[in-house]
Amino acid sequence: MPPKGTPPSFESELPGRPGANWAALLLPPMAALSIGAAAIHFAVTAEHFTEFWLFGVFFAAIAWFQALWPLAYLRWPTRITAGIALAANLGTVLLWAWTRFVGIPLGPSVGDAEVVGVADLAASGFETLLCGILLLLVVPAVRSRLLATPVSRSAWIGSGFWVVVVVAITTWVLALHGNDIMVMGH
């Protein structure tokens, strides 16, 4: 256990759980969020290829990245691996926001703002939550502040459980109903 006041590291054992560390504990909710976003991106890749080939390439690439990233993190649970995922997912969320509020930056519909649909909102929500967890792993100051007490650590553990449950249910519903539940979709 690190000295008092030292932020828990990736390798820090969890109090009362010998052999368990923060990196391993946070993998299930991170994997659920990443795979949930990947499933949504896989589902819309073909549609985006018909709009513009580069859109399809982007959706295929981010879907594969999000599907495979948890395996890479399982093998290499480092700040670098977490940082790469943080950059990719944060970039995707920012691009999503840009295309909704400013307009599509390139392609045949350049300048047109996309409508917000339930599926893309869910994927962006998953990515945003994933970025929050990744921030814990990448930035020690965030980790030390948010995991400073046993109560806050327990809250994060409980939140992680509910993230997995909500992502699983949302992904399942979207897989079953897809475009039928679009709020404002195309």
Residue ranges and their predicted role:
Residues 2-186:
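Membrane-interface extramembranous regions
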